Protein backbone atom coordinates (compact mmCIF):
# COMPACT_ATOMS: atom_id res chain seq x y z
CA UNK A 1 0.00 0.00 0.00
CA UNK A 2 1.52 3.31 -1.07
CA UNK A 3 0.54 6.88 -0.42
CA UNK A 4 0.92 9.69 -2.92
CA UNK A 5 3.25 12.47 -1.75
CA UNK A 6 2.67 15.87 -3.32
CA UNK A 7 5.15 18.69 -3.18
CA UNK A 8 3.25 21.90 -3.75
CA UNK A 9 0.26 24.00 -2.78
CA UNK A 10 -1.53 27.31 -2.99
CA UNK A 11 -3.34 30.00 -1.07
CA UNK A 12 -7.00 29.52 -0.22
CA UNK A 13 -9.66 31.83 1.18
CA UNK A 14 -12.59 29.61 2.13
CA UNK A 15 -12.67 26.97 4.85
CA UNK A 16 -11.83 23.52 3.53
CA UNK A 17 -11.42 24.89 -0.01
CA UNK A 18 -8.58 22.48 -0.38
CA UNK A 19 -8.25 21.55 -3.97
CA UNK A 20 -7.98 25.05 -5.43
CA UNK A 21 -4.75 25.48 -3.52
CA UNK A 22 -3.08 22.62 -5.36
CA UNK A 23 -2.98 24.37 -8.73
CA UNK A 24 0.68 25.21 -8.40
CA UNK A 25 1.78 21.69 -7.57
CA UNK A 26 4.75 20.72 -9.67
CA UNK A 27 5.04 16.99 -9.08
CA UNK A 28 1.78 15.16 -8.65
CA UNK A 29 2.12 11.43 -8.27
CA UNK A 30 5.53 11.24 -6.59
CA UNK A 31 5.05 8.13 -4.52
CA UNK A 32 6.06 7.72 -0.92
CA UNK A 33 7.05 4.13 -0.20
CA UNK A 34 6.94 4.72 3.53
CA UNK A 35 3.27 3.86 3.95
CA UNK A 36 3.07 0.09 3.81
CA UNK A 37 1.10 -2.52 5.69
CA UNK A 38 -1.83 -0.17 6.27
CA UNK A 39 -3.96 -2.46 8.42
CA UNK A 40 -5.89 -0.35 10.93
CA UNK A 41 -5.35 -1.04 14.61
CA UNK A 42 -8.72 -1.33 16.32
CA UNK A 43 -8.15 -3.24 19.55
CA UNK A 44 -10.14 -1.67 22.38
CA UNK A 45 -8.42 0.21 25.20
CA UNK A 46 -9.13 3.26 27.31
CA UNK A 47 -9.33 6.26 25.00
CA UNK A 48 -6.82 8.63 26.57
CA UNK A 49 -4.39 6.07 27.91
CA UNK A 50 -1.63 4.03 26.26
CA UNK A 51 -2.50 0.39 25.56
CA UNK A 52 0.07 -0.82 28.03
CA UNK A 53 1.94 0.97 30.81
CA UNK A 54 5.35 1.75 29.33
CA UNK A 55 7.69 4.42 30.64
CA UNK A 56 6.05 7.81 30.07
CA UNK A 57 9.03 9.09 28.07
CA UNK A 58 8.46 6.42 25.40
CA UNK A 59 4.77 7.17 24.88
CA UNK A 60 3.80 9.01 21.70
CA UNK A 61 1.13 11.60 22.56
CA UNK A 62 -1.09 12.57 19.62
CA UNK A 63 -3.56 15.45 19.82
CA UNK A 64 -6.71 15.85 17.69
CA UNK A 65 -8.83 18.99 17.38
CA UNK A 66 -12.25 19.26 15.69
CA UNK A 67 -14.22 22.36 14.76
CA UNK A 68 -17.56 20.65 15.41
CA UNK A 69 -18.99 17.86 17.58
CA UNK A 70 -17.57 14.35 17.47
CA UNK A 71 -20.99 12.92 16.67
CA UNK A 72 -22.05 15.18 13.79
CA UNK A 73 -22.54 12.24 11.39
CA UNK A 74 -20.06 14.02 9.13
CA UNK A 75 -16.64 15.60 8.77
CA UNK A 76 -15.75 15.79 12.46
CA UNK A 77 -17.11 12.35 13.30
CA UNK A 78 -14.98 10.84 10.55
CA UNK A 79 -11.83 12.27 12.14
CA UNK A 80 -12.93 11.22 15.62
CA UNK A 81 -13.46 7.67 14.39
CA UNK A 82 -10.00 7.78 12.84
CA UNK A 83 -8.55 8.77 16.18
CA UNK A 84 -10.47 6.01 17.92
CA UNK A 85 -8.81 3.53 15.57
CA UNK A 86 -5.53 4.15 17.39
CA UNK A 87 -6.83 2.47 20.52
CA UNK A 88 -4.72 -0.49 21.45
CA UNK A 89 -1.63 0.69 19.59
CA UNK A 90 1.36 0.16 21.85
CA UNK A 91 2.92 3.21 23.47
CA UNK A 92 0.44 5.65 21.93
CA UNK A 93 -1.99 7.88 23.78
CA UNK A 94 -4.49 10.27 22.24
CA UNK A 95 -5.99 13.52 23.45
CA UNK A 96 -8.79 15.30 21.61
CA UNK A 97 -11.07 18.31 21.88
CA UNK A 98 -14.21 19.09 19.88
CA UNK A 99 -16.08 22.31 19.15
CA UNK A 100 -12.97 24.45 18.78
CA UNK A 101 -13.60 27.48 16.53
CA UNK A 102 -11.20 28.69 13.85
CA UNK A 103 -9.99 31.55 16.04
CA UNK A 104 -7.15 32.13 18.49
CA UNK A 105 -8.96 29.62 20.71
CA UNK A 106 -7.42 26.81 18.67
CA UNK A 107 -3.98 28.22 19.43
CA UNK A 108 -4.76 28.01 23.13
CA UNK A 109 -5.96 24.42 22.77
CA UNK A 110 -2.85 23.39 20.84
CA UNK A 111 -0.57 25.10 23.34
CA UNK A 112 -2.30 23.37 26.25
CA UNK A 113 -1.96 19.99 24.57
CA UNK A 114 1.75 20.60 23.99
CA UNK A 115 2.62 22.07 27.39
CA UNK A 116 0.36 20.04 29.68
CA UNK A 117 -0.34 16.82 27.80
CA UNK A 118 3.13 16.58 26.22
CA UNK A 119 1.68 16.12 22.75
CA UNK A 120 4.36 15.95 20.05
CA UNK A 121 2.12 15.21 17.03
CA UNK A 122 -0.89 17.48 16.52
CA UNK A 123 -3.79 16.93 14.11
CA UNK A 124 -5.89 20.13 13.92
CA UNK A 125 -8.42 18.92 11.36
CA UNK A 126 -10.36 21.99 10.23
CA UNK A 127 -9.32 24.06 7.23
CA UNK A 128 -9.29 27.42 9.00
CA UNK A 129 -6.87 26.21 11.66
CA UNK A 130 -3.96 26.38 9.23
CA UNK A 131 -3.26 30.07 8.70
CA UNK A 132 -2.38 31.76 10.96
CA UNK A 133 -2.97 29.40 13.89
CA UNK A 134 -0.98 26.26 13.03
CA UNK A 135 1.75 28.32 11.38
CA UNK A 136 2.15 30.49 14.48
CA UNK A 137 2.36 27.56 16.89
CA UNK A 138 4.68 25.62 14.58
CA UNK A 139 7.17 28.47 14.67
CA UNK A 140 7.05 28.52 18.47
CA UNK A 141 7.36 24.73 18.84
CA UNK A 142 9.83 23.53 16.17
CA UNK A 143 10.11 20.03 17.69
CA UNK A 144 6.35 19.41 17.55
CA UNK A 145 4.84 18.09 14.31
CA UNK A 146 1.64 19.66 12.98
CA UNK A 147 -0.41 17.58 10.51
CA UNK A 148 -3.26 19.47 8.85
CA UNK A 149 -6.10 17.91 6.89
CA UNK A 150 -5.91 19.67 3.54
CA UNK A 151 -3.49 20.48 0.77
CA UNK A 152 -2.01 23.72 2.06
CA UNK A 153 1.66 22.96 2.75
CA UNK A 154 4.08 24.83 0.48
CA UNK A 155 7.69 23.76 0.38
CA UNK A 156 10.04 26.61 1.14
CA UNK A 157 7.27 28.79 2.54
CA UNK A 158 5.95 26.87 5.53
CA UNK A 159 7.85 25.48 8.53
CA UNK A 160 9.46 22.05 8.15
CA UNK A 161 7.42 20.73 11.09
CA UNK A 162 4.12 21.28 9.22
CA UNK A 163 2.51 18.75 6.88
CA UNK A 164 -0.81 18.16 5.10
CA UNK A 165 -2.87 15.11 4.17
CA UNK A 166 -6.04 14.50 2.16
CA UNK A 167 -7.68 11.90 -0.08
CA UNK A 168 -9.50 11.09 -3.30
CA UNK A 169 -12.96 10.61 -1.86
CA UNK A 170 -14.50 11.19 -5.27
CA UNK A 171 -13.56 7.55 -5.97
CA UNK A 172 -16.10 6.46 -3.37
CA UNK A 173 -18.60 8.96 -4.79
CA UNK A 174 -18.19 7.33 -8.20
CA UNK A 175 -19.05 3.93 -6.71
CA UNK A 176 -22.00 5.44 -4.83
CA UNK A 177 -23.15 6.86 -8.16
CA UNK A 178 -23.12 3.37 -9.66
CA UNK A 179 -25.42 2.19 -6.88
CA UNK A 180 -27.68 5.22 -7.38
CA UNK A 181 -27.75 4.54 -11.11
CA UNK A 182 -29.08 1.05 -10.49
CA UNK A 183 -31.64 2.11 -7.90
CA UNK A 184 -33.22 5.22 -9.44
CA UNK A 185 -36.57 4.74 -11.11
CA UNK A 186 -36.99 8.31 -12.33
CA UNK A 187 -33.49 8.68 -13.74
CA UNK A 188 -33.21 11.89 -11.70
CA UNK A 189 -30.63 12.24 -8.93
CA UNK A 190 -30.10 15.16 -6.54
CA UNK A 191 -26.97 16.67 -5.01
CA UNK A 192 -26.98 19.20 -2.14
CA UNK A 193 -23.62 20.99 -2.12
CA UNK A 194 -22.08 23.75 -0.05
CA UNK A 195 -19.91 25.69 -2.50
CA UNK A 196 -18.79 25.25 -6.12
CA UNK A 197 -15.11 24.75 -5.32
CA UNK A 198 -13.03 22.15 -7.21
CA UNK A 199 -13.26 19.42 -4.57
CA UNK A 200 -17.05 19.72 -4.38
CA UNK A 201 -17.41 19.84 -8.17
CA UNK A 202 -15.25 16.74 -8.44
CA UNK A 203 -17.57 14.86 -6.09
CA UNK A 204 -20.65 15.98 -8.03
CA UNK A 205 -19.07 14.99 -11.33
CA UNK A 206 -17.72 11.64 -10.14
CA UNK A 207 -21.07 10.70 -8.60
CA UNK A 208 -22.80 11.60 -11.87
CA UNK A 209 -20.28 9.72 -14.01
CA UNK A 210 -20.75 6.62 -11.87
CA UNK A 211 -24.51 6.79 -12.30
CA UNK A 212 -24.32 7.48 -16.04
CA UNK A 213 -22.00 4.51 -16.50
CA UNK A 214 -25.14 2.47 -15.72
CA UNK A 215 -27.77 4.62 -17.46
CA UNK A 216 -26.37 7.32 -19.80
CA UNK A 217 -29.61 9.31 -19.65
CA UNK A 218 -29.48 9.90 -15.89
CA UNK A 219 -29.29 13.51 -14.70
CA UNK A 220 -28.11 15.03 -11.43
CA UNK A 221 -29.81 18.21 -10.22
CA UNK A 222 -27.46 20.23 -8.00
CA UNK A 223 -28.33 22.94 -5.48
CA UNK A 224 -25.60 24.98 -3.77
CA UNK A 225 -26.49 26.20 -0.27
CA UNK A 226 -23.64 28.70 0.00
CA UNK A 227 -21.86 27.42 3.10
CA UNK A 228 -20.67 24.26 4.86
CA UNK A 229 -23.26 24.04 7.62
CA UNK A 230 -26.69 25.55 6.93
CA UNK A 231 -29.23 22.98 8.17
CA UNK A 232 -32.33 24.98 7.18
CA UNK A 233 -31.10 25.54 3.63
CA UNK A 234 -30.01 21.90 3.38
CA UNK A 235 -33.51 20.75 4.29
CA UNK A 236 -35.06 23.24 1.86
CA UNK A 237 -32.74 22.10 -0.92
CA UNK A 238 -33.53 18.44 -0.33
CA UNK A 239 -37.27 19.07 -0.32
CA UNK A 240 -36.99 21.15 -3.48
CA UNK A 241 -35.12 18.35 -5.25
CA UNK A 242 -37.74 15.79 -4.21
CA UNK A 243 -40.49 18.11 -5.45
CA UNK A 244 -38.70 18.19 -8.82
CA UNK A 245 -38.86 14.42 -9.12
CA UNK A 246 -35.47 13.14 -7.94
CA UNK A 247 -35.54 9.80 -6.12
CA UNK A 248 -31.92 9.51 -4.91
CA UNK A 249 -30.05 12.32 -3.14
CA UNK A 250 -26.52 12.78 -1.86
CA UNK A 251 -24.54 15.78 -0.64
CA UNK A 252 -21.26 17.51 0.14
CA UNK A 253 -21.78 19.52 3.32
CA UNK A 254 -20.12 19.26 6.72
CA UNK A 255 -22.89 17.17 8.28
CA UNK A 256 -25.16 15.19 5.93
CA UNK A 257 -27.57 14.49 8.81
CA UNK A 258 -30.30 16.89 7.68
CA UNK A 259 -30.15 15.81 4.04
CA UNK A 260 -30.32 12.11 4.92
CA UNK A 261 -33.14 12.53 7.46
CA UNK A 262 -35.16 14.72 5.10
CA UNK A 263 -34.78 12.18 2.30
CA UNK A 264 -36.01 9.41 4.59
CA UNK A 265 -39.05 11.45 5.61
CA UNK A 266 -39.87 12.10 1.97
CA UNK A 267 -39.57 8.42 1.10
CA UNK A 268 -36.64 8.57 -1.33
CA UNK A 269 -33.22 6.92 -1.40
CA UNK A 270 -30.12 8.62 0.00
CA UNK A 271 -26.36 8.20 -0.26
CA UNK A 272 -24.12 9.49 2.52
CA UNK A 273 -20.87 11.40 2.81
CA UNK A 274 -17.94 11.70 5.26
CA UNK A 275 -19.15 9.00 7.69
CA UNK A 276 -21.83 6.31 7.88
CA UNK A 277 -25.34 7.75 8.19
CA UNK A 278 -27.26 4.47 7.73
CA UNK A 279 -28.83 4.71 11.20
CA UNK A 280 -30.56 7.94 10.12
CA UNK A 281 -32.32 6.30 7.19
CA UNK A 282 -32.85 2.57 7.82
CA UNK A 283 -35.13 2.19 4.80
CA UNK A 284 -33.69 4.49 2.18
CA UNK A 285 -29.93 4.60 2.83
CA UNK A 286 -28.16 2.97 -0.11
CA UNK A 287 -24.47 3.49 0.74
CA UNK A 288 -22.08 6.42 1.12
CA UNK A 289 -18.60 7.81 0.49
CA UNK A 290 -16.66 7.58 3.75
CA UNK A 291 -13.23 8.62 4.95
CA UNK A 292 -11.05 6.05 6.70
CA UNK A 293 -8.70 8.25 8.70
CA UNK A 294 -7.67 5.32 10.91
CA UNK A 295 -5.37 4.22 8.10
CA UNK A 296 -3.68 7.61 8.00
CA UNK A 297 -3.38 8.14 11.74
CA UNK A 298 -2.12 4.62 12.39
CA UNK A 299 0.63 4.94 9.80
CA UNK A 300 1.65 8.39 11.02
CA UNK A 301 2.04 6.88 14.50
CA UNK A 302 4.11 3.97 13.20
CA UNK A 303 6.40 6.25 11.23
CA UNK A 304 6.96 8.59 14.17
CA UNK A 305 7.66 5.65 16.47
CA UNK A 306 10.27 4.50 13.94
CA UNK A 307 12.05 7.84 14.28
CA UNK A 308 10.76 9.39 11.07
CA UNK A 309 9.58 12.99 11.14
CA UNK A 310 8.60 15.86 8.89
CA UNK A 311 11.76 17.62 9.95
CA UNK A 312 14.14 14.84 8.87
CA UNK A 313 12.11 14.21 5.69
CA UNK A 314 11.18 10.74 6.89
CA UNK A 315 7.52 11.73 6.44
CA UNK A 316 6.46 13.52 3.22
CA UNK A 317 4.93 16.93 3.79
CA UNK A 318 1.96 16.55 1.45
CA UNK A 319 0.17 13.22 1.24
CA UNK A 320 -2.76 11.93 -0.80
CA UNK A 321 -4.50 8.58 -1.11
CA UNK A 322 -7.66 6.89 -2.30
CA UNK A 323 -9.11 3.38 -2.34
CA UNK A 324 -5.78 1.77 -3.07
CA UNK A 325 -4.13 3.46 -0.11
CA UNK A 326 -7.03 2.86 2.28
CA UNK A 327 -8.00 6.53 2.68
CA UNK A 328 -11.61 6.11 1.57
CA UNK A 329 -14.25 3.42 1.72
CA UNK A 330 -17.88 2.73 0.91
CA UNK A 331 -20.59 2.45 3.55
CA UNK A 332 -22.19 -0.98 3.85
CA UNK A 333 -25.01 -1.45 1.37
CA UNK A 334 -28.49 -0.73 2.68
CA UNK A 335 -31.28 -3.33 2.59
CA UNK A 336 -32.85 -1.80 -0.52
CA UNK A 337 -29.75 -2.20 -2.71
CA UNK A 338 -30.25 -4.82 -5.41
CA UNK A 339 -27.83 -7.71 -6.06
CA UNK A 340 -27.13 -6.23 -9.50
CA UNK A 341 -26.17 -2.88 -7.99
CA UNK A 342 -23.87 -4.53 -5.46
CA UNK A 343 -22.18 -6.60 -8.16
CA UNK A 344 -21.55 -3.58 -10.39
CA UNK A 345 -20.29 -1.46 -7.49
CA UNK A 346 -17.97 -4.18 -6.20
CA UNK A 347 -16.51 -4.67 -9.68
CA UNK A 348 -15.78 -0.96 -10.07
CA UNK A 349 -14.34 -0.81 -6.56
CA UNK A 350 -11.90 -3.61 -7.39
CA UNK A 351 -10.81 -1.75 -10.51
CA UNK A 352 -10.19 1.44 -8.52
CA UNK A 353 -8.14 -0.52 -6.04
CA UNK A 354 -5.95 -2.05 -8.75
CA UNK A 355 -5.69 1.22 -10.67
CA UNK A 356 -7.35 0.02 -13.86
CA UNK A 357 -10.42 2.28 -13.67
CA UNK A 358 -10.08 5.83 -15.00
CA UNK A 359 -12.98 8.05 -13.96
CA UNK A 360 -12.11 11.01 -16.16
CA UNK A 361 -11.65 9.62 -19.66
CA UNK A 362 -10.77 11.41 -22.89
CA UNK A 363 -13.64 13.20 -24.59
CA UNK A 364 -15.76 14.02 -21.54
CA UNK A 365 -17.93 17.10 -22.01
CA UNK A 366 -19.29 19.59 -19.53
CA UNK A 367 -22.98 20.39 -19.31
CA UNK A 368 -22.64 23.07 -21.99
CA UNK A 369 -21.29 20.58 -24.53
CA UNK A 370 -17.64 21.64 -24.34
CA UNK A 371 -14.94 18.94 -24.22
CA UNK A 372 -13.21 19.43 -20.87
CA UNK A 373 -11.16 16.22 -20.69
CA UNK A 374 -9.05 16.00 -23.87
CA UNK A 375 -7.13 12.95 -22.68
CA UNK A 376 -7.43 10.38 -19.90
CA UNK A 377 -6.81 11.99 -16.50
CA UNK A 378 -5.71 9.77 -13.63
CA UNK A 379 -6.51 10.75 -10.06
CA UNK A 380 -3.28 12.69 -9.62
CA UNK A 381 -3.73 14.76 -12.80
CA UNK A 382 -3.11 18.42 -12.04
CA UNK A 383 -5.93 19.41 -14.41
CA UNK A 384 -8.50 17.90 -12.04
CA UNK A 385 -7.29 20.08 -9.18
CA UNK A 386 -8.57 23.21 -10.94
CA UNK A 387 -11.94 21.75 -11.92
CA UNK A 388 -14.40 24.56 -12.64
CA UNK A 389 -17.06 22.75 -14.65
CA UNK A 390 -20.01 20.42 -14.25
CA UNK A 391 -20.01 17.25 -16.32
CA UNK A 392 -22.62 16.45 -18.95
CA UNK A 393 -25.75 15.24 -17.20
CA UNK A 394 -25.55 17.69 -14.29
CA UNK A 395 -28.36 20.24 -14.15
CA UNK A 396 -27.09 23.39 -12.50
CA UNK A 397 -24.68 26.29 -12.85
CA UNK A 398 -21.54 27.43 -11.08
CA UNK A 399 -22.30 30.87 -9.69
PLM region spans:
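N-terminal secretory signal peptides
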Residues: 1-38
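C-terminal segment of N-terminal export signals and the immediately downstream linker at the start
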Residues: 8-12, 34-62
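A residue-level marker of the well-folded mature domains of exported/periplasmic proteins
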Residues: 49-399
Amino acid sequence: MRLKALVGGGTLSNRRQIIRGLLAVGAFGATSRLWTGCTPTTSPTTGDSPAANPDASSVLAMGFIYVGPKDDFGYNQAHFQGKEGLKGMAEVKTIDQAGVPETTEVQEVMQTMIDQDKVTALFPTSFGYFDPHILKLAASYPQVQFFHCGGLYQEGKHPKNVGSYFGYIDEAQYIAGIVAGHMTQSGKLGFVAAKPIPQVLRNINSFTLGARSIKPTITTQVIFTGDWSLPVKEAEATNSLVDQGIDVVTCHVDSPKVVIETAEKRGIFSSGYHANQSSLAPKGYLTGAEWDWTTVYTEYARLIQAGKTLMNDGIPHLLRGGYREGFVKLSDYGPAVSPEAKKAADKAKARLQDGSLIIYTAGLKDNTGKVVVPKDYGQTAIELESMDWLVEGVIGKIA
